[in-house]
Amino acid sequence: MCNFNIKRQINKLYTLTTVSYFRIAGASWVALLALRGFSLLQIGILESIFHIASSCFEIPSGVVADVFGRKRTLALSKLVSVLSCQAMILSDNFGTVAFAIAFSAISYNLESGTIEALAYDSLKSVKQEEKYNQYASTEMMLYRITSSTATFCAGVALWLGYKKAYAIDIFFGIIALGIACSLREISGFIGADGEPTNPQTDDHKQKQMSEEKQ
């Protein structure tokens, strides 16, 4: 860790949060599906599929982070997100949309808590874990600003159409993937209870609830 630049790592995590949550199609997916002719019943079923897939993969996604590391898990999350958007562009019926929605849920699960855990481990590696609350506060602010901006762009997404809107999400997803791959992996930090560190702050829980509503 002698050449580890904690400031650069934290700034990359801030940038990753900002880029990751600017998803104009993801923020307006219900309206986009309605625009494509899907009924309210079908949209409700698709949202149920999202939550079911999210519940089924919640524990396995945590195992992935513990076994393969936070950095690889974040990168995989961004890759799955890009594939989900691509699947949505190519979808032409209820079944293919459901497949894309399930992939989106897996992406959310892989990312959920992983950025926070990597930030905490990074700060702990340089004995600055007391700065984690400051990081979490700033990260939550960036998340809210970015996700709100994406929501405000819902009209733009509807004007562009679902294919172009998801293409924009893919563009930002690829940037996020590049940032995730450039992060420094931190390993070997175990919490006081003998478990790998994985901070679950109130801010993170609020963010997770907001994500599942999108």
PLM region descriptions:
Residues 102-143:
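Cytoplasmic helix-loop-helix junction between adjacent transmembrane helices
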Residues 2-56, 89, 214:
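Helix-loop boundary and gating motifs at the non-cytosolic
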Residues 79-93, 97-98, 181:
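C-terminal ends and interior cores of transmembrane alpha-helices
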Residues 35, 88-90, 147-168, 172:
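Transmembrane alpha-helix termini and helix-breaking/packing motifs in multi-pass membrane transporters
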Residues 1-10, 183-214:
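Juxtamembrane intracellular "pre-TM" segments in multi-pass secondary transporters
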Residues 51-59, 144-148:
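Residue-level signature of mid-helix packing/kink "hotspots" within the transmembrane helices
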Residues 18, 84, 95-111:
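Hydrophobic core of transmembrane alpha-helices in multi-pass small-molecule transporters
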